[in-house]
Structure formats: structure tokens, C-alpha cells
Regions:
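Gly/serine-rich nucleotide phosphate-binding loop at the start of the catalytic core
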Residues: 1
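Active-site- or DNA-interface-adjacent structural scaffold in DNA-acting proteins
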Residues: 4-61
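A residue-level signal for conserved active-site and pocket-lining positions in enzyme catalytic cores
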Residues: 11, 51, 79, 133, ...
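Generic secondary-structure signature for well-ordered alpha-helical cores
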Residues: 24, 36, 102, 131, ...
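Short coil/turn segments at secondary-structure boundaries
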Residues: 31-33, 45-47, 161-165, 245-251
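Polybasic low-complexity intrinsically disordered regions
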Residues: 38-112, 118-131, 138
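An anionic, glycine-rich sequence signature occurring as long contiguous blocks
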Residues: 138-236
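Basic, amphipathic alpha-helical segments enriched in Lys/Arg and hydrophobic/aromatic residues
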Residues: 234-284
Length: 284
């Protein structure tokens, strides 16, 4: 108070002016340092989940050529957002994720990402920083997916793989997840295209509700030799960042924020994540 001559809480307009002149990149660096300072001392072997979220309220604003899209890095085990990077076009998510990974200290962590970010260059960036990756494989790599699918769908091959099934009940449905893992990857035609590829896995999920039954397959590649339990755990951790995005939408109403200034939108996103991090840390 003495240094700045401020003796009461600034009004809405002053806060808006301050948020406008703060550089989001600088604010994000401070945010990351703060998060690392509040992390438990013995936090190791962590999973960092990457995903993007579009701030939908910016979609119809004249100052935006396309809606603001923000990529977040979430420490899954702690439920803490570690960092973020923005782009004004969702089609630029891949290079934005790669830029974010280069800026972060990810040594010793497992990086999980959706199929969009299952990219050879992204895998190389992760491995160079002495981290591991777990990528979901879908139709954006059709040949890779087909080779993995053909191998895993073969019952004879399934018998040579590690497998485990787990059933959970909740939210009005029964969910059975069966995981398959092989650390023998020499048979895969595309093995040398992916840095340190060491594991191939799949999860078959069966759902049962009052409306009937359904099922789906998910395929994965990883630079780390995983057990089936580790595959199930890491694959589920990928959804932690989606939970954070849900909180931003539902409880913080981010998609309804009509502020047009780009810096303010980006800085408000960081402040909301500060609040979520504090709630996660101090639930009591």
C-alpha cells in the first residue's frame, strides 16, 4: 500500500486496464514458477496432459479472425494446471503444443495427448527432453492405426500380450475396460518413424446403461515400456485436463466472457486457472 499509494481495492476499470497491459507470456512464466513452488517436494513420475480449449465467446468478435484457442498443460496426479499457450486458430494447435513443450521442463514425466497431437515431431521433442509420451492413435495416421488394429484384433496375438480387465459402476452405467499391452514392437512397419517407440497398447471399453450396450476401441503408442495397469492409469489421466476445461465452462462461465481485448482474455484465463489450482490444493 505504501509503495503504490493504494489504500483500497481498485475498481473494475482499473483492474481491466492493468490486465490489458500485462503481457500474457510474462504472466504465464510467473504462473508456472508459482505452480512449481506450491507442488509437493516429492512429486515425481508425473503425468502431464495436453489439450486445447476454444473460448467460444471470442468467435463472433470483430477483433478475432477466429476464436481464441488455448492449449493447457495439466499435471494430472495433482489436478494442477502448469502452463498454457494460446493461438487464434485451432488449426495451429499442433505447432502451439510443440512450442509449449519446448518451453516446459518435462524431464522424467509422461506426456499424454489426444490423436490430433500424435505427431512424429512432437514425439521427438518429448524424447529429446528426456520425457516419455503416450499418444492416442486414430484416423489421422491411417496406416499406423490399421497395423496396430490388425495386430490387436487377432485373437492369437492377444494371447501373447499382457491383458487386464476392470469394471466400474457409477453415473447410471457399468463400464468395463480391458487393456492389452505389448512391448515387442519390431513387427510394426512404422516403428522407426517414432522416437524410442517401445510399447503398443489398446483399451476396449464396454458400456452398459438402461438404454443398452455399446463399446469402443482406443489404440496407443508409447516411448516407455508399460504394464497394462500403467496403460489404464495414464490413459485415464489424459482426461484430467478435460475436467479443468469443464470447470472453466460451467463454474467460471468462460465461454460467456464478452471482453474483446485479447490480452485481457488470455490473462483472465490464467487467473481462472490460479483459482482452480488453489481450490485443488486447499479443498478443506
Amino acid at each position: 500500500k505504501e509503495e503504490f499509494g493504494i489504500y483500497r481495492i481498485p475498481c473494475y476499470y482499473w483492474i481491466t486496464c492493468i490486465l490489458k497491459i500485462i503481457k500474457p507470456e510474462s504472466f504465464n512464466r510467473c504462473f508456472e514458477k508459482w505452480v512449481r513452488s506450491i507442488m509437493p517436494e516429492k512429486a515425481d513420475k508425473l503425468t502431464i496432459s495436453l489439450d486445447g480449449k476454444t473460448v467460444r465467446s471470442t468467435g463472433k468478435m470483430q477483433k478475432y479472425e477466429s476464436p481464441l484457442h488455448i492449449i493447457s498443460a495439466q499435471i494430472s496426479e495433482l489436478g494442477l494446471t502448469l502452463s498454457q499457450c494460446s493461438t487464434e486458430d485451432k488449426s495451429n494447435e499442433i505447432p502451439t503444443v510443440q512450442k509449449l513443450l519446448k518451453e516446459l521442463n518435462i524431464k522424467g514425466t509422461m506426456i499424454t495427448a489426444d490423436a490430433l497431437n500424435c505427431q512424429k515431431e512432437t514425439a521427438e521433442i518429448i524424447v529429446k527432453q528426456k520425457a516419455d509420451y503416450l499418444f492416442s492413435v486414430k484416423d489421422n495416421h491411417p496406416n499406423l492405426k490399421k497395423n496396430i488394429e490388425d495386430f490387436i484384433q487377432d485373437e492369437a496375438m492377444q494371447n501373447t500380450m499382457q491383458s487386464i480387465s476392470k469394471t466400474e459402476k457409477g453415473h447410471g452405467r457399468i463400464e468395463k475396460r480391458t487393456a492389452f499391452v505389448t512391448n515387442e514392437t519390431d513387427w510394426l512397419e512404422q516403428k522407426n518413424d517414432w522416437s524410442n517407440l517401445a510399447c503398443i497398447g489398446a483399451i476396449h471399453t464396454e458400456f452398459e446403461t438402461d438404454k443398452g450396450k455399446s463399446s469402443e476401441w482406443h489404440y496407443y503408442i508409447s516411448s516407455k515400456k508399460l504394464t497394462v495397469e500403467e496403460l489404464l492409469r495414464h490413459a485415464r489421466k489424459e482426461w484430467s485436463v478435460e475436467t479443468m476445461h469443464w470447470l472453466l465452462d460451467v463454474h467460471f462461465e468462460e465461454d460467456w466472457c464478452r471482453v474483446e481485448d485479447k490480452n485481457i482474455q488470455k490473462n483472465l484465463n490464467i487467473f481462472r486457472k490460479c483459482a482452480i489450482n488453489l481450490i485443488k490444493l486447499y479443498k478443506s
